[in-house]
């Protein structure tokens, strides 16, 4: 699967898609393949603060529970409630199934993240 060129990525396998000062955050195709079938998503509430590099929730699969790490610091503006009843949407379309949306406190943080080519090189080294 191709990694969207307009997204930015973390070494913990999260992605962020920007729309102005709002970032939609999810997990990459590489992450969902490593996890297997996702059965539960634990996410923060609207209004909660998230910090770059810190955990903001977790995904549970048939194999393991994996922490989610925020790529940016900010405030949660939306939670994808569809994932509460259909967490497998992450397996089906990992780069469309956002988990939370965040009002980004410092847009410069996004520039420090990996672009698609750098992320693909990173996962090639990990494999």
Predicted region positions:
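Acidic, low-complexity mobile loops and tails
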Residues: 1-55, 92-127
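Short, glycine/small-residue-enriched coil/turn segments at secondary-structure junctions
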Residues: 2-4, 65-72
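Conserved hydrophobic positions within beta-strands
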Residues: 13, 59, 68, 73-76
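Short, Lys/Arg- and Gly-enriched loop/turn segments at beta-strand edges
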Residues: 58-69, 86-88
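Residue-level detector of flexible, active-site-proximal loop/helix-junction positions
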Residues: 63, 83, 106
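Charged, alpha-helix-enriched surfaces in structured cytosolic catalytic cores
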Residues: 71, 85, 114
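Short, charge-rich, low-complexity interaction segments located
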Residues: 76-93
């Amino acid at each position: 699967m191709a990694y969207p060129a307009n997204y930015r990525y973390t070494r913990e396998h999260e992605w962020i898609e920007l729309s102005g000062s709002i970032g939609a955050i999810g997990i990459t195709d590489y992450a969902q393949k490593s996890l297997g079938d996702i059965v539960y998503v634990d996410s923060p509430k609207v209004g909660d603060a998230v910090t770059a590099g810190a955990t903001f929730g977790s995904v549970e699969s048939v194999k393991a529970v994996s922490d989610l790490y925020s790529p940016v610091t900010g405030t949660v503006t939306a939670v994808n409630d569809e994932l509460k009843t259909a967490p497998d949407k992450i397996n089906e379309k990992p780069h469309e199934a956002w988990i939370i949306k965040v009002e980004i406190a410092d847009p410069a943080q996004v520039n420090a993240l990996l672009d698609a080519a750098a992320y693909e090189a990173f996962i090639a080294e990990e494999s």
